[in-house]
Amino acid sequence: MKDFKDKVMFITGAAHGFGQVIAEGAADRGMKLTIVDIDEPALKKTYQHILDKGAEVLMVTADVTKEASVDDAVEQAMEKFGRIDLLINNAGIALPGRIWELPTRDWEWIMHINLMSQVYAMKRVIPIMIQQKTHADILNVASIAGLVDTPGMPSYHASKFASVGMTEATAYDLQRANIDIDMHVMCPGFVQTDLYHTENHRPAQYSDPTDPYYQSEAYLKGQQFAKYVITNGKPIDTIADTVFKALEDNRFYILTHPEYNPLIEDRVKRIVTDGAPDVHIMDGIM
């Protein structure tokens, strides 16, 4: 996508972090927006920031873990704007916890928001983009955790590896069908967001505060670690420019932390040389 002015973007997870700065960056570039999030008070702030920039914007409060909610948000966007040129699936959470400790409901939550919300939006929006008969783009926000593995977060890795793989496979399908939609996957490292506030947005269907896991040392240490690495991550103020430059250049993989590239290379090397995961590769990093 070379020209953003007057194009229509649909973005999830727009109340905080990447979603907020990307949405505001889109407004700066003259785009029209549908912004979606479960956190209505915070979403209203993003909405006002975009209005202040003079952009046309629709705000939809929705739980994107539910397919019907995603369908309704897309329908509202189409009613207002009549098209979607850029879909950004950004909604996501992080839940630390080893596989034998993390409650099943947490696995269900993270897979539904980090993966299935992307599936729901793509299933609904790709047919719309095809019918438009004009160029369109889809960007799925995954993580460096979708390219390399680390200890302590198997649910997060599972969801992000799945997002990367799904995006790659969809790119093949679109190319084979000669459909003019370009796919992109963003795999950021640690960035200064409020991702460690995941618990503030937990839907009731995934909540059980009486579960002893949430008072366990493992859980509390995981929360502390998540807060530390995120608050000490890369400043977020360059993310919007990174995203839109990548879209202009039609880059498929959008990486924000080149210092992690050796970890990606090491993982591929281990795969092709019959190597095995070695926790010591994380020494000095995690």
Swiss-Prot record:
Gene Ontology terms: cellular component: cytoplasm
Sorted UniProt keywords: Cytoplasm, Detoxification, NAD, Oxidoreductase
Top-level enzyme category: oxidoreductase
SUPFAM superfamilies linked: NAD(P)-binding Rossmann-fold domains
The keyword Oxidoreductase appears for this protein: yes
Active site (catalytic residues): 156 (proton acceptor)
Pathway(s) of this molecule: Lipid metabolism; fatty acid metabolism
Enzyme Commission number(s) from the entry: 1.1.1.-
Molecular-function annotations in GO: oxidoreductase activity, acting on the CH-OH group of donors, NAD or NADP as acceptor
Family indicated by similarity: Belongs to the short-chain dehydrogenases/reductases (SDR) family.
Name of the protein described by the UniProt record: CLA biosynthesis dehydrogenase/reductase
